[in-house]
Amino acid sequence: MGSEMCIRDRMMGVFSGVLAALKRNTVFDFIPMAIAMIGICVPTFLMGPLLVLIFGINLEVLPVSGWGQLPGDKILPSLTLGFAYAAYIARLSRGGMLEVLNQDFIRTARAKGLTERMVVIKHAMQGGLIPVVSFLGPAIAGLLAGSFVVETIFQIPGLGRFYVEAAFNRDYTMILGTTIFFSAMIVFFNLLSDLAALWLNPRSRDAS
């Protein structure tokens, strides 16, 4: 489940952060950053029950359990698990973009007559999203850890739920195997994010 959420949350967070940076001090900046602050402050184990209480019990507009069985049954688990990480990525994207947009090479690109779209996509985003790429490794670790809680709350048949059930049943073989798998995934994605950040940053490549 965590792997499914990673790409979607990164895209949503990057879009919100880049938009907030380009529209600084406007409603397109204030509203996404206010929502991002809420997502950062509210932990996963509290966000899940709150969403279930509001949308599943009180409003009765979304199912509160299952995965792939009913229309809309992926919405609440996705929001619970991915909201906080999309919020972190949005703030990182905004900060990175604001820093890059004030650099001399951006002013030079604009002075050459490049369109604002080309300046943002070709020049600004490459440097502005380096903090997001560096955050990918810890984000994957957090998504994997958060899947334990979310899969248990929403009764999703994933590795996180199996891990929790194995702990209650004292199934040490399952606990050991799942721990090794999660550890290998975390190490792999940390290495991948470091390599991607090195590739995106020319100064790091020159120093190495």
Question: What kind of region is each of these model predictions?
Answer:
Residues S3-E4, R8-V27, T44, W67-S208:
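Alpha-helical transmembrane segments of integral membrane proteins
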Residues R10, V27-G39:
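N-terminal signal-anchor/first transmembrane alpha helix
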Residues A34-P63, T80-A84, R91:
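Membrane-water interface segments at the C-terminal ends of transmembrane alpha-helices
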